[in-house]
A protein has these predicted regions:
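Gram-negative bacterial Sec-dependent N-terminal signal peptides
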Residues: 2-45
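Boundary of Sec targeting at the N-terminus
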Residues: 45-52
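Gram-negative and organellar
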Residues: 51, 57, 62, 76, ...
Length: 842
C-alpha cells in the first residue's frame, strides 16, 4: 500500500517557540525595579546599595527563568501601593517573561485604560493579548507601539506573528515580505516571515527565509533554533537533528524528543517503499521500531508533559509495525489505544484495517477503511492514498462475502481515475498509473465474484494495451488457472518471467500452475524459493499450504444406501461402501494405495454380500496419470484374484484421453455375482473441457461377462453452466447412454439394447463461505426418456437434494438424496437412495 504522512504538521507554540527578541533589561526597567525594590519592606537601617543588590539578584534570577521571587515582590509592592505604575509596569514585563498572559492582563486592568504604557510594558501587553488569542486587541497594541516607538522593531515583528496566528496568513506574509524588503539583512525579520510562511502552509518558503536568517546570525541560538524548526516543518528532521546536535542545549528536552519522533516518522514513511535488495526491505522498519523502543520510555518518564508525544509515537509506530508485517501487534496496540480512550487519527486507520484483513477479520477491516475514506481521504484529496484505501475496502467486502458493495467500491474507484493526467511541467498529458491499478482491481474483482469470462476479457484487453506489464500477465494467468487452463497460464507466466524473472507474485503463480500440471519438483522449488524470501506474504503462505496438503496422505470414502425402492433390478436394502487410502508422495511421482469395499443387496433369489480389497501404485507426472492394482474379490465360494490398469493423458488444456481395464470389475451387477457371474471391463474415454463452465465426456465401454454375454456401452455426459453468481450456480446436465448385449436370458438385468436420455438442471447454492470453509446445497431435477428394445419407451424423472461441506483444504464431505422413477422391462420402478463421499488428507 502507498505510505502517507503519519502525523499532521506540528505548529510551534507562539512566542515561546519564536523568541526573536532576546530578553534584555532596558535602563528604564532597571531604574523602575530599583525604585520598586527600595519601597519594599526592608530594615530601616538598610542602605540603598542593599536594595540595589536585592534588585540585581531578583533580576538575574528572573532572566535565568526564576520569575516567581521578583513577581512575588512586585505583587506585595502593588498590594501596599496600588497606584505605583512603575511597579505595575515591571510586573507586566516579568509576567510576560514568565509566560503568564492572564497576570499581564490583570495588572493592566488594574491600571485603567487611559494610561499610556512604556514600550516594554506595551510589548508585554500586546504579547499577552496574542497568547490569549485576542487577535484584534493584540494587533491594536502592536500598531500603537509602531506609532509611538517607531525605532522598536519588536512591534512590527509582533504584528506579523499575530496576523499569522489569527489565520490571516496572507496578510502576515505580505507584511513580512515588506519588512524583509526594507531590511534584507535583518535576521529577526526573516524569522518572522518564515513563521508566517509556516502558518500559510508553505514550508519550503519558510525554510528559505530561516536559512537566510541563519546565514546572517549563525551565532544566535534563537535564530538557529528557528532554523531547526523550519527544517522540521519542511520534512527534513534528520538535517534538523544534525544541526541541533551541534549545539547542546539548543532545544528543550521535549522539543528534542519531538524532533526525534519526526525523524523516526520519516523512516516509517520510507519503510515499505521498494528497496535495492529483498534482504533490505525490513531494514528501515526495524531501525524505526528500535528508535521507538528507545524514545517511548523517555516520553513516559516525562509524565503528563510527554503524554501527547507518547500518543503520537504509539500511533506512528502502528505504521512501522505494519511495514514489518507484525500484524497481530498492530491490532493489539490499536485496541490498547482504543481501550485507553485514545482517538486514533483517521490517516492511521488504513494500516490497522490492513492488519485486520491480514488476520482474516474482514468485518473489522471494512469499518476502518470506510472511516479512513470518509475522514482522511476524500475524493478531492490524496488520490493515491484514496485508491489504496478503496482497494483495501474492496478486499474487505469480498472476503466478507459481500459482493454487491464490493462491486460498488471498485466501480467508484475506477470512475474516479482518469486515463490521462496532466503533470506540471509536462507539455502533454501522461498515462495515469492509478487508472491502471484501479482497472486491474476491477478486473480481478470479477474473478473473485466467479465471473471468469468478464475477468478474462478485461485482463486480455489490458495485456494487449500494456504487453510489457508483468503484473497484468500474472493476473491474467491467475484467471486462466481459474478457467482450468493451466498450460495457457504457464505460457503467460513465461512471458511475464522474461520481464521480471524474480517477481514474487510471478513465482507464486508459477508454483500453483506447476501443481496443476503435476510438475512436482518445479512446484517444490518455487515454493521453497518464495517461502525463503517472503515468509510473511499471504500469497506465499497459500502456496506453501497447497504444497503441504499435496504431500499428505489421502483417504477417500464413497458409498450409497438404498432408502426405499420397489426395484427388482437393484435389490432391496442395497448398500455399498469403499475406502481407499493413498500414501504421501514417494519420490515426487509415486503413491501407493490400498482399499477395501463392501456391497450388499436383497433379491428374490436371496441376499448377496460382496467384499473386495485392492492395493496398487499411482504414477503422476506432467500430462500423464497411471494406476495399477491387484485385488481379491469374495462374493461366495472363496476369494478370487483380479486387477486393474488405468491411464489418463492430457493432450492440452481442453482435451484428455484415457482408458482403463479391469479383471473382475467391481462394477459387476450384484445380481450377477449372486449367480457366480463376474465381468471383465474395458473403458476408453475422451474428455473435452472447454472451461470450468463446460465439460463433455465421451465413453465407450465393452464388458465380457463370464456367462458369455458381451455388453457394449457408449455414452455422452456433459455439464454446461448457464448462470453464474457469487453464491449461486446453475448447470445443465446431459446424460445420453446406449447399451447392447449379446444375451437376454441372464439372471441380471440385461436388455438386448437400450437408450437413456436424461437432461437435468443442477442449482448449487452457497450457504456459507469463509476463506477455505464452504457449505453448499444442491438441487437437482431432470426429466427424460428410457427406450428398451422390446418394451418401448417410457418417461424418466429425477429429483435430488444434497449438501457439501469443505474446510481447511483437507476435509471434503458431501451427501445427496435422489429419487428416480423409470421403467425396467416395461414396468415402472421407483428408487430413493443416498450417495455420500468423503475425502480427508492428513
Amino acid at each position: 500500500m502507498t505510505r502517507h504522512s503519519r502525523s499532521p504538521a506540528r505548529v510551534p507554540a507562539d512566542t515561546r517557540r519564536l523568541q526573536t527578541l532576546r530578553r534584555r533589561t532596558p535602563v528604564q526597567l532597571a531604574v523602575g525595579l530599583a525604585a520598586a525594590m527600595s519601597c519594599l519592606a526592608v530594615p530601616a537601617h538598610a542602605a540603598p546599595a542593599q536594595a540595589d543588590q536585592q534588585y540585581d539578584a531578583l533580576i538575574q534570577r528572573a532572566r535565568a527563568g526564576d520569575h516567581e521571587p521578583a513577581l512575588t515582590a512586585l505583587r506585595e509592592r502593588l498590594a501596599q501601593a496600588p497606584t505605583d505604575r512603575r511597579a505595575a509596569y515591571d510586573r507586566m514585563i516579568i509576567a510576560g517573561w514568565a509566560g503568564r498572559p492572564a497576570e499581564v492582563l490583570e495588572t493592566y486592568g488594574q491600571l485603567g485604560d487611559a494610561v499610556q504604557l512604556p514600550a516594554d510594558a506595551l510589548a508585554a501587553l500586546a504579547r499577552a493579548h496574542r497568547d490569549e488569542r485576542q487577535w484584534d486587541a493584540s494587533l491594536a497594541r502592536y500598531r500603537e507601539g509602531q506609532q509611538r516607538f517607531p525605532a522598536r522593531q519588536d512591534f512590527v515583528l509582533g504584528e506579523i506573528l499575530t496576523l499569522a496566528d489569527s489565520g490571516r496568513s496572507a496578510d502576515a506574509v505580505a507584511a513580512g515580505q515588506a519588512l524583509v524588503r526594507r531590511q534584507p539583512s535583518n535576521a529577526d525579520a526573516r524569522i518572522a516571515l518564515a513563521y508566517a510562511y509556516i502558518r500559510a502552509r508553505e514550508p519550503y518558503e519558510a525554510l528559505y527565509e530561516a536559512d537566510k536568517a541563519n546565514t546572517l546570525a549563525p551565532q544566535r541560538n534563537d535564530i538557529v533554533r528557528e532554523y531547526v524548526r523550519a527544517l522540521q516543518h519542511a520534512g527534513l528532521p534528520e538535517a534538523a537533528l544534525r544541526i541541533a546536535g551541534e549545539r547542546p542545549g539548543l532545544l528543550s528536552r521535549m522539543d528534542s524528543l519531538s524532533l526525534q519522533l519526526d525523524a523516526v516518522a520519516e523512516q516509517v514513511r520510507l519503510a515499505d517503499k521498494p528497496t535495492r535488495t529483498e534482504a533490505e526491505r525490513f531494514a528501515i522498519a526495524d531501525r524505526a521500531l528500535a528508535r521507538y523502543d528507545e524514545l517511548m520510555p523517555q516520553l513516559r518518564a516525562l509524565g503528563p508533559q510527554g503524554e501527547g508525544e507518547l500518543r503520537r509515537a504509539r500511533v506512528d509506530r502502528l505504521a512501522a509495525l505494519h511495514a514489518r508485517v507484525r500484524m497481530r501487534e498492530v491490532v493489539d496496540e490499536y485496541e490498547s489505544l482504543r481501550a485507553e480512550g485514545v482517538q486514533v487519527p483517521a490517516y492511521a486507520l488504513t494500516d490497522v484495517a490492513a492488519a485486520y484483513l491480514y488476520l482474516r477479520q474482514p468485518e473489522q477491516s471494512e469499518r476502518l477503511y470506510q472511516q479512513a475514506l470518509s475522514e482522511a481521504y476524500p475524493p478531492e484529496g490524496d488520490t493515491e492514498a484514496r485508491l489504496a484505501a478503496q482497494t483495501g475496502l474492496y478486499y474487505s467486502h469480498a472476503e466478507a462475502e459481500k459482493f454487491p458493495p464490493a462491486g460498488d467500491v471498485v466501480q467508484q474507484a475506477s470512475a474516479e481515475q482518469p486515463l490521462w493526467r496532466w503533470v506540471q511541467g509536462q507539455p502533454a498529458a501522461q498515462p495515469n498509473d492509478l487508472w491502471l491499478d484501479a482497472a486491474q482491481v476491477a478486473a480481478q474483482s470479477r474473478l473473485q465474484a466467479d465471473d471468469t469470462v468478464n475477468a478474462q476479457q478485461r485482463l486480455e484487453e489490458m495485456v494487449q494495451r500494456a504487453p510489457a506489464n508483468s503484473r497484468l500477465r500474472v493476473a491474467l494467468a491467475d484467471v486462466y488457472r481459474a478457467r482450468a487452463w493451466p498450460r495457457r497460464a504457464e505460457s503467460e507466466l513465461k512471458l511475464a518471467e522474461a520481464l521480471e524473472p524474480r517477481s514474487m507474485p510471478l513465482e507464486v503463480q508459477q508454483g500453483h500452475a506447476a501443481l496443476d500440471l503435476q510438475e512436482w519438483r518445479q512446484a517444490e522449488m518455487l515454493r521453497n524459493d518464495t517461502l525463503a524470501r517472503y515468509p510473511e506474504d499471504l500469497a506465499v503462505r497459500r502456496l506453501d499450504r497447497e504444497w503441504n496438503v499435496h504431500n499428505k496422505a489421502e483417504l477417500r470414502i464413497e458409498g450409497y444406501r438404498g432408502l426405499a425402492n420397489d426395484s427388482a433390478v437393484v435389490g432391496n436394502g442395497n448398500f455399498g461402501i469403499e475406502s481407499v487410502l493413498y500414501s504421501p508422495p514417494i519420490n515426487y511421482d509415486w503413491r501407493a494405495f490400498g482399499g477395501i469395499g463392501y456391497a450388499t443387496g436383497r433379491f428374490e433369489e436371496g441376499n448377496v454380500d460382496y467384499r473386495w480389497a485392492r492395493t496398487g501404485v499411482q504414477y503422476r507426472v506432467r500430462d500423464l496419470t497411471l494406476e495399477g492394482e491387484v485385488s481379491t474379490h469374495s462374493y461366495g465360494g472363496g476369494g478370487r484374484a483380479g486387477g486393474r490398469l488405468s491411464a489418463q493423458y492430457d493432450i492440452d488444456d481442453r482435451w484428455q484421453v484415457g482408458a482403463s481395464g479391469a479383471l473382475r470389475s467391481t462394477g459387476t451387477p450384484l445380481r450377477a455375482l449372486k449367480q457366480g457371474i463376474y465381468a471383465d471391463t474395458l473403458s476408453v474415454f475422451t474428455r473435452y473441457r472447454a472451461s470450468e463452465r463446460s465439460e463433455w465426456l465421451f465413453t465407450v465401454a465393452p464388458s465380457r461377462f463370464s456367462d458369455g454375454n458381451d455388453r457394449l456401452e457408449a455414452g455422452v455426459t456433459g455439464v454446461q453452466r448457464f448462470y453464474t453468481a457469487p453464491h449461486l450456480k446453475a448447470d445443465l446436465l446431459v446424460d445420453l447412454w446406449a447399451s447392447r448385449n449379446t444375451r437376454d436370458d441372464t439372471p441380471y438385468y440385461n436388455p438386448r439394447s437400450d437408450l437413456t436420455m436424461l437432461p437435468s438442471v443442477r442449482l448449487t447454492h452457497t450457504l456459507y463461505r469463509r476463506y477455505e470453509t464452504a457449505w453448499e446445497q444442491q438441487f437437482l431435477a431432470g426429466a427424460g426418456a428410457y427406450a428398451q428394445r422390446g418394451f418401448g419407451t417410457g418417461a424418466m424423472m429425477l429429483i435430488g437434494y444434497g449438501q457439501r461441506f469443505r474446510t481447511n483444504d483437507v476435509f471434503d464431505v458431501g451427501a445427496t438424496i435422489t429419487g428416480t422413477s423409470r421403467p425396467y422391462d416395461g414396468r415402472r420402478e421407483r428408487e430413493l437412495r443416498i450417495v455420500f463421499d468423503l475425502t480427508y488428507r492428513f
